[in-house]
Amino acid sequence: MAESTVVAVPRDGTITITNGDATSYTVAYEAGDFNANFDKAERIVIYDRATIVGLRSGSDPIPSISFSCHLRELADDSEDTILDFVYKTNNSSGATSTGGTGFEQFLVTVVFQADMSALSGSNTKVTFEKVLLTAALAEGNPTSISFTGEVYGSIARATV
């Protein structure tokens, strides 16, 4: 199958956050500004008297993601808010991390999906495992929450 000729735009995108209990939160009222860094392992350059003679892989990278959404609610005891879901508070206080053994922080899975199938384009997604999300609040018109994520697990790109 040939690569799609339909270009993704913000209205095609969806961001879903899932915890270790398989409970999902679909980000709503978002700006359409999802970003991801697909860095490779650290590069160790091998020199012989100042001439490059090799390249080796060093430490694994810590890829990053970011996105923002409009503030709708800071906390809720009976329903998930995005901040409660990410920080494991209030209604989400009993959530399980996706990290597993050896990972102390609360981690989640983040999926970005771009669905252009309505225009005969592709329906594609990228899944980020073991993500540590943090948030920053900025007052404005509208007030927004910016999220930054560090990816400590695998990254898988796939067709849906």
Predicted regions and their residues:
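Signature of extracytoplasmic/envelope-associated structural regions
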Residues: 1-160
